[in-house]
Swiss-Prot record:
This is Uncharacterized protein C14orf119 homolog. Its main location: mitochondrion. The keyword Phosphoprotein does not apply. The keyword Membrane does not apply. It is found in: Mitochondrion. Pfam families: DUF4508 (PF14969). Keywords: Mitochondrion. GO terms for cellular component: cytosol; mitochondrion. It comes from the Eukaryota.
Length: 142
């Protein structure tokens, strides 16, 4: 059962009964984030707090690859992390968390992705500084 109604739009044949909002006000603030998206972000931030240094580094590489999707170097770095010996064992909790992270992130709008980085920066400013440095380091690389 969905918590949000999918039938909130007014059919085009009915005139709008809502007052119009000036464009400068409507565009100044992003639409509110969905409850589900905010809960997904909370989960990731909670998991992040318990990750080890190497796990955070792996997450950093993934975050950079998502922030700079057209660049080849982050993809090569991520491939380097894969291990053929891992194919015979079930995934660990961290790997499951990364899979959920990937699935959720792909469903977020750009403003929600930016909000996630902002929230992460509040709790982990040093990590986000490393993220920004890593993104900047991809400039000019293919």
């Amino acid at each position: 059962m969905s918590l949000e109604s999918s039938s909130t739009s007014v059919p085009p044949c009915f005139p709008s009964v809502l007052p119009s909002v000036p464009d400068d006000i409507a565009s100044s603030s992003p639409p509110p984030m969905s409850y589900i998206t905010s809960q997904e972000m909370k989960c990731i931030l909670y998991w992040f707090a318990s990750w080890s240094g190497p796990q955070r580094e792996r997450f950093l590489q993934d975050l950079v690859a998502k922030a700079v999707p057209g660049k080849l170097q982050p993809l090569l770095d991520a491939l380097e992390q894969l291990s053929m010996s891992a194919a015979n064992r079930p995934p660990c909790i961290f790997e499951c968390q990364l899979r959920l992270w990937d699935q959720w992130f792909r469903g977020w709008a750009e403003q929600e992705r930016n909000e996630f980085v902002r929230q992460l920066e509040v709790s982990e400013p040093d990590f986000v500084a490393k993220f920004y440095q890593a993104v900047a380091a991809t400039a000019g690389k293919d």
